[in-house]
UniProtKB/Swiss-Prot annotation:
This is Ribosomal RNA large subunit methyltransferase K/L. Its EC number is 2.1.1.173, 2.1.1.264. It holds the Pfam family Methyltrans_SAM. One of its GO terms (molecular function) is RNA binding. It catalyses: guanosine(2445) in 23S rRNA + S-adenosyl-L-methionine = N(2)-methylguanosine(2445) in 23S rRNA + S-adenosyl-L-homocysteine + H(+); guanosine(2069) in 23S rRNA + S-adenosyl-L-methionine = N(2)-methylguanosine(2069) in 23S rRNA + S-adenosyl-L-homocysteine + H(+). InterPro entries: 23SrRNA_methyltr_KL, DNA_methylase_N6_adenine_CS, RlmKL-like_Mtase, RlmKL-like_Mtase_CS, RlmL_1st, SAM-dep_methyl-trfase, SAM-dependent_MTases_sf, THUMP_dom. It is found in: Cytoplasm. It comes from the Bacteria. Specifically methylates the guanine in position 2445 (m2G2445) and the guanine in position 2069 (m7G2069) of 23S rRNA. One of its GO terms (cellular component) is cytoplasm. The gene is rlmL. Its main location: cytoplasm. Residues 43-154 form the THUMP domain.
Length: 719
């Protein structure tokens, strides 16, 4: 009796153990990501041919205590390798695990290879060569818990490969995981549907099961082909038996399988895969997204008075592995997909059983279905849940609105602000700003896009609860506004005093043009925490435009230069835009070009604003400065705190401000206190105009910013 080991993805061990027992294996014992078993050679062959869950089947050659590299070498050297392959065969050694003596897997593999070669050489045999890509014999070794385990691979290419793939979607489901989903769903051959079938893996594997087709029947190469102990006669008899079973199974197979996908290119690959697998006649493919999902089974005719149409309707099994996204920004569109799937199931699949795999419990919750069972599976290293549901016969598509209080508030805000924005001539505004404490986020509208920015929740609120509320908000926002889920951008930021550090989120570029009181401005909704336009300063920018005619304008800490655009359009004779960021200064120039504001009268300076201010000596009639609340950038020589340093800032600006000039000073420091006495001593006076610069969509947030007009003491302050 030989000892074997079958590897598998985590979560499949129990299924694999039962399968091996059914094949005739003895002393079956589960471990993490694998199953030990014993049997005659035929059992090893059957496992290679028939296992739907295994990744590899290996023959255990030796297991021994190992403390250092010498133990590994000697243990490998004692194995009678010449009984397993000849010197003319090529070999590869795969090694996993480390200890203080074997600190990397390459070294472990090298010691075993040396032991093999030395044994062949000492016995006067030709030494085998190494071929890492396509060896005749693959030796696999694992080091763990002080023991080395050396095995010979019988599988060849990994057993999840069925050799029917002609092409795949972006993230193909491995075949053994697909089989685990089918097994855990409880499918018993009834009609099956995959509404997001991708390359068709689930449906093709289901067809193999229904037709009693061995999963490895199509492969041409196994790891034992060049093994000296290979029994070709035994193997051929097992293959012939499998072929007969497949032929008979296909003849009597009447299973109904249905697959849908929104992508016609992926669907074409699914059809090609099914054809290559020999099961195309069992699967009906249709291009459709989940919003178009329909029950593929016909509604039967019934005799009035006997049974209802719903009771007579044929039911089936729906199994799917919807996309679950690993990046936060993908979630809004995926929420919409899962919500639509749940609605479709309640609307048209009454009585069906449903099994959905996802790495996101939050997305599964968007189905609004109660699971009967739940299983833990792994898609590669990603932990997933497989949830089984039963759609009630009397279920209906309409459900209680998600986050109803939030949805009602958003609906109210939308009704008020949409009309106001249209009248004002703006197409981006704040729609919601943590109006309800339990829904702690800001939602900004940019034309037909929504940007949802989550604020950090208090530490005493569980992260899972916070996450679920955020996803509920996104779901409700999509429904209330009618926005496409793909045009909802989700961001996470902490509520801080002042502006955030401008953190880059991605390398991609997504620019779009928006309108603001006649100004055309570029915004980027995806790539930064901020979009390039601070909406709360909209009235301030408009005011600057109205004040700018014929004036020399300076914009310090200019960000993307939107205030400069308004000043330029307002007729400023010249503008100077200063910012430390090369990225934002280029953005400012793009904004100016978009409004045909070009020429030498418009200057752009990349510099540390505080250092530039201390050295500048030009005069300006209108100055706008909106510094950060706090900054300690690597490019700055020292830190800046707006509360601590604003008086020094004003003293520098006084030197640049023309005798009858106006300085507009704004910041986002909550509870900022202007040093009026210090200003007076410096020969300046200030007027608080915050209430005049706070736009309608920020009326609820009294501390979003504060704004001041500052002039020389002898000049009248402008309102």
């Amino acid at each position: 009796m030989k000892e074997f080991f079958a590897t598998c993805p985590k979560g499949l061990e129990n299924l694999l153990a039962d399968e091996l027992t059914t094949l005739g294996a003895e002393q079956v014992r589960e471990t993490v990501a694998g199953v030990h078993f014993k049997g005659e050679l035929a059992i090893g062959y059957k496992a290679c041919l028939w296992s739907r869950f295994a990744s590899r089947i290996v023959l255990v050659l030796s297991e021994f205590q190992m403390n250092d590299d010498l133990d590994l070498y000697l243990g490998a050297h004692t194995i009678p390798w010449e009984e397993h392959f000849s010197g003319t065969s090529t070999i590869a050694v795969d090694f996993t695990g480390t200890n203080p003596a074997i600190r990397n897997t390459q070294y472990g593999a090298l010691k075993i290879k040396d032991a093999i070669v030395d044994r062949f050489t000492k016995r006067g045999h030709v030494r085998p060569d190494v071929d890492k890509k396509a060896p005749d014999i693959r030796i696999m070794a694992h080091l763990g818990k002080g023991k080395a385990n050396i095995t010979l691979d019988l599988s060849g290419p990994a057993l999840h490969q069925r050799f029917y793939r002609q092409g795949t979607g972006e993230a193909p489901l491995k075949e053994n995981l697909a089989c685990a989903m089918i097994a855990r769903s409880g499918w018993a051959g009834e009609p099956m549907m995959d509404p997001m079938c991708g390359s068709g893996t689930l449906l093709i594997e289901a067809a193999f099961i229904a037709a009693d087709m061995a999963p490895a029947l199509r492969r041409e190469r196994f790891g034992f082909d060049r093994w000296l102990q290979h029994d070709s006669e035994l193997w051929q008899s097992l293959m012939m038996e499998a072929q007969v079973r497949a032929k008979r199974g296909m003849q009597r197979c009447e299973v109904k399988l249905f697959g849908c996908d929104a992508d016609p290119r992926v669907l074409m690959k699914a059809r090609d895969n099914a054809k290559a697998a020999g099961v195309a006649h069992l699967i009906t493919f249709k291009q459709a997204d989940v919003t178009q999902l329909e029950n593929p089974l016909p509604m039967p005719a019934v005799v009035e008075g006997e049974v209802s149409q719903e009771e007579a309707r044929q039911v089936g099994m729906l199994i799917s592995n919807p996309p679950y996204g690993e990046r936060l920004g993908e979630f809004p569109a995926l929420l919409e997909v899962h919500q639509a799937l749940g609605d479709a199931l309640r609307r048209g699949f009454q009585g069906w059983r449903v099994s959905i795999l996802s790495a996101s419990p939050e997305l599964l919750s968007c189905l609004r279905l109660r699971a009967d069972k739940q299983y833990r599976l792994f898609n590669g290293a990603l932990e997933c849940q497989l949830r089984n549901y039963q759609i009630a016969l009397d279920s209906v598509a309409s459900q209680k609105e998600v986050a109803q209080d939030f949805a009602n508030r958003l609906r109210k805000n939308l009704k008020t602000l949409e009309k106001w924005a249209s009248k004002e001539g703006i197409d981006c505004y704040r729609l919601y700003d943590a109006d309800l404490p339990e829904y702690n986020a800001a939602i900004d509208r940019y034309q037909d896009y929504l940007v949802v920015q989550e604020y950090a929740a208090p530490k005493d609120i569980p992260a899972q609860k916070t996450r679920q509320r955020l996803l509920d908000m996104v779901q409700a926002a999509i429904k209330v506004t009618g926005m496409d889920g793909e045009k909802v951008i989700l961001k996470v930021r902490e509520r801080q005093e002042g502006k955030q550090q401008y953190q880059k989120l991605a390398a991609e570029q997504h620019r779009m043009e928006v309108q603001e009181y006649g100004a055309r401005l570029w915004v980027n909704l995806y790539d930064y925490l901020d979009t390039g336009l601070f909406l709360d300063h909209r009235q301030t920018r408009r005011m600057l435009g109205q004040m700018a005619k014929g004036k020399r304008f300076l914009n310090l800490f200019a960000y993307t230069g939107s205030a400069t655009v308004h000043a330029g359009l307002g007729g400023a004779s010249e503008t100077t835009t200063v910012d430390m960021s090369h990225t934002y200064l280029n953005w400012a120039q793009d904004n100016m070009r978009l409004n045909s504001l070009v020429g030498r009268q418009h200057k752009f300076v990349q510099a540390d604003c505080l250092k530039w201010l201390s050295e500048a000596d030009d005069q300006y009639d209108l100055i706008f400065i909106d510094p950060p609340t706090f900054s300690n950038s690597k490019r700055m020589d020292e830190s800046f705190d707006v509360q601590r340093d604003h008086l020094l800032l004003m003293q520098h600006l006084k030197r640049l401000l023309a005798a009858d000039g106006t300085l507009v000073f704004s910041n986002n420091k909550r509870h900022f206190k202007m040093d009026l006495a210090g200003l007076e001593a410096a020969g300046l006076k200030a007027q608080n105009i915050t209430s005049k610069t706070r736009p309608k969509d920020f009326e609820r947030n009294q501390h979003i910013h504060n704004c001041w007009i500052i002039t020389h003491a002898e000049a009248p302050a402008e309102a």
